[in-house]
Amino acid sequence: MTISPPEQEASVKIVVDRDPVKTSFERWAKPGHFSRTLAKGPNTTTWIWNLHADAHDFDSHTNDLEDISRKVFSAHFGQLAVIFIWLSGMYFHGARFSNYEAWLSDPTHIKPSAQVVWPIVGQEILNGDVGGGFQGIQITSGFFQLWRASGITSELQLYSTAIGGLVMAGLMLFAGWFHYHKAAPKLEWFQNVESMLNHHLAGLLGLGSLSWAGHQIHVSLPINKLLDAGVDPKEIPLPHEFLVNRDLTAQLFPSFAKGLTPFFTLNWAEYSDFLTFKGGLNPVTGGLWLTDTAHHHLAIAVLFLVAGHMYRTNWGIGHSIKEILEAHKGPFTGAGHRGLYEILTTSWHAQLAINLALFGSLSIIVAHHMYAMPPYPYLATDYGTQLSIFTHHTWIGGFCIVGGAAHAAIFMVRDYDPTNNYNNLLDRVIRHRDAIISHLNWVCIFLGFHSFGLYIHNDTMSALGRPQDMFSDTAIQLQPVFAQWIQNTHYLAPNLTAPNALAPTSATWGGDVVAVGGKVAMMPISLGTADFLVHHIHAFTIHVTVLILLKGVLFARSSRLIPDKVNLGFRFPCDGPGRGGTCQVSAWDHVFLGLFWMYNSLSIAIFHFSWKMQSDVWGSVTAKGVSHITGGNFAQSSITINGWLRDFLWAQASQVIQSYGSALSAYGLMFLGAHFVWAFSLMFLFSGRGYWQELIESIVWAHNKLKVAPAIQPRALSIIQGRAVGVAHYLLGGIATTWAFFLARIIAVG
């Protein structure tokens, strides 16, 4: 940190342009108003595709970084408005169409439902009996558990929150309009990173966490303590009563009677009745102790509030990001981070690339924590919801990571300036890209042959009737000893590091089964040869995804094959006529291919999760012990390719295939429909543009003959457009197929 005399620093001011862009509905109503070419209207059918491709490509509308920044800023408010409207809809469904109050009174026997299908031509078959005399579609979003954790006890509260969501959405829409048309920030405001860090860290994350901690302490904890004790939700005081009447809370948490005295006398241990450090899960709800999570959010708030005061603005004290970056260089890294500050303050694509990669990775980490440390009451025993949120956060993470690579490549093509990046880290990575990519390629080949080879060996030995020669827990063992050591360490360590804690951080490390209502919430997850094998398939598929995406970024500007690639742009089909073998080489094509491998990687990850949990974790608990859904067949079945096909895909597809005539029949139809969407994608991916252009011209000839020729000339999709439509349907079809397969199965057996 440095302290500088104030006169050296340019003082930070909030500067805006008043009324920079007039609000014109006439202009907005004109399709393609953002582009001179598109505004002329369509000559061919390509126009509508270009309209969609370029509507949000602000770089193509203008070269003015200030205007681009304002458009991005304004679009963020639009995004927030959409999120608030969506949230409002979720809360409204909870208020209007759900059995939330019934579920709250008996969450172990009644299933969550927030959608009732109207009887038009027999669809009411979808309204299954979810218990408590309610017929509806069983939902797996986890909202009921979240509402219970936040202390919502009635449908009126859900209505109020839904209205609040709409009010917030309106505010966001207004803010998006206001900050583009009425008071638009100047470029220097967007580039003032220290203020931005201070405000986002202290305001958004610090005060945000503090507000949530406050809500948890004053509203959620007392209400949940009463709910856990079996008090009828209708008898529980309303949230504001806990706020205005301290005695009410003090009956549940005695330290409340002492007020703020322990805080100001530094006698903080007094508050340990509602800020706990228990570890493990609440045996009543199977969720984390809410007093632990309140403590966690309070601690996080303190950290972020401190972090939000670290950066130097008008007071001449604190860190400067530019100074930190430029001072940060090692003995072997040339100019180090010099030049990176300029990249990150002038290229939104560079910013977005880093944020997407980190946010995507975080989403996948969240997916793992949601089952290992289920944060909400009764979440862990709702297997459909557990499977859904794991799958959801995994897919979201994958798309974000691929998006990170996409925007890194766009940055390389559009925003990278070689003259400002001599011998810094980025330049050095680009200069030894051949070594990086060829080594990564070798790693992929090694992992691919060895991981797949282990399975092929097992399939062969199994077919030859030689189980003693297979890699398995009962023959040739390949135990994941490192993973087992980590598990054991995490199980034993709290004895030393947190001697007063009741349990380690997660029941997955070791210890006893946590059961709620006769179902397993969480228990130690034993790892063996089967996990070792599939883990290496994960390593293989992830490395291939990284290889494709990183190659796209590092070779976005040039390669030995096409030295002037940067002049061709981010997406192009081939390097012009007369240069065979230069197709599918653009940065865009690497993103396109990376998406398929992302899909491969994550399909295997969610399949692994689904089967492992059904086999080794989820199940019912009786006096005789735990009875798992698939009876622990993962260890012996998943060690062959045939086992995955027969005992996972085929065996567990029976529920979706036989769902007709039951409340799950929609999943059967979706399973078929999504397969169709997926197959439809192959039409775009396997055939070339010329095939379609030829067909179209024949069809146009027929129209001309009949004098019904269109005014807008029909044209085949461009090569890139065809691939984009193809990959979109491939992923949509694949994900929806998996969704139907998972949910029909887990709702039927879970």
Swiss-Prot record:
The transmembrane residues are 72-95, 158-181, 197-221, 293-311, 348-371, 387-413, 435-457, 532-550, 590-611, 664-686, 724-744
Known EC number = 1.97.1.12
What does the record say about its membrane topology? Multi-pass membrane protein
The annotation note on the cofactor reads:
P700 is a chlorophyll a/chlorophyll a' dimer, A0 is one or more chlorophyll a, A1 is one or both phylloquinones and FX is a shared 4Fe-4S iron-sulfur center.
Q: So where does phylloquinone get bound?
A: 692
Keywords recorded for this protein, A-Z: 4Fe-4S, Chlorophyll, Chloroplast, Chromophore, Electron transport, Iron, Iron-sulfur, Magnesium, Membrane, Metal-binding, Oxidoreductase, Photosynthesis, Photosystem I, Plastid, Thylakoid, Transmembrane, Transmembrane helix, Transport
Task: Quote the record's binding site residues for [4Fe-4S] cluster.
Answer: 574, 583
Q: Name one Pfam family in it.
A: PsaA_PsaB
A single Gene Ontology MF term assigned here is: magnesium ion binding
**Example GO biological process term?**
photosynthesis
Per UniProt, the enzyme's principal EC class comes to oxidoreductase
Q: In which compartments does the protein localize? A: Plastid, Chloroplast thylakoid membrane
Under the heading Gene3D superfamilies, the entry gives: Photosystem I PsaA/PsaB
The record's SUPFAM superfamilies line, in alphabetical order, gives: Photosystem I subunits PsaA/PsaB
This entry carries the following GO cellular component terms, namely: chloroplast thylakoid membrane; photosystem I
Q: Which residues bind chlorophyll a'?
A: 675
Listed under catalytic activity are: reduced [plastocyanin] + hnu + oxidized [2Fe-2S]-[ferredoxin] = oxidized [plastocyanin] + reduced [2Fe-2S]-[ferredoxin]
Q: Where do the annotations place chlorophyll a binding?
A: 683, 691
- Entry-linked NCBIfam families: psaA (TIGR01335)
Summarize the protein's role: PsaA and PsaB bind P700, the primary electron donor of photosystem I (PSI), as well as the electron acceptors A0, A1 and FX. PSI is a plastocyanin-ferredoxin oxidoreductase, converting photonic excitation into a charge separation, which transfers an electron from the donor P700 chlorophyll pair to the spectroscopically characterized acceptors A0, A1, FX, FA and FB in turn. Oxidized P700 is reduced on the lumenal side of the thylakoid membrane by plastocyanin.
Q: Which family does it belong to?
A: Belongs to the PsaA/PsaB family.
Oligomeric state and interaction partners are given as: The PsaA/B heterodimer binds the P700 chlorophyll special pair and subsequent electron acceptors. PSI consists of a core antenna complex that captures photons, and an electron transfer chain that converts photonic excitation into a charge separation. The eukaryotic PSI reaction center is composed of at least 11 subunits.
User: What is the name listed in the Swiss-Prot or TrEMBL entry for this protein?
Assistant: Photosystem I P700 chlorophyll a apoprotein A1
> From what organism does this protein derive?
Chlorokybus atmophyticus (Soil alga)
Gene behind this protein? psaA
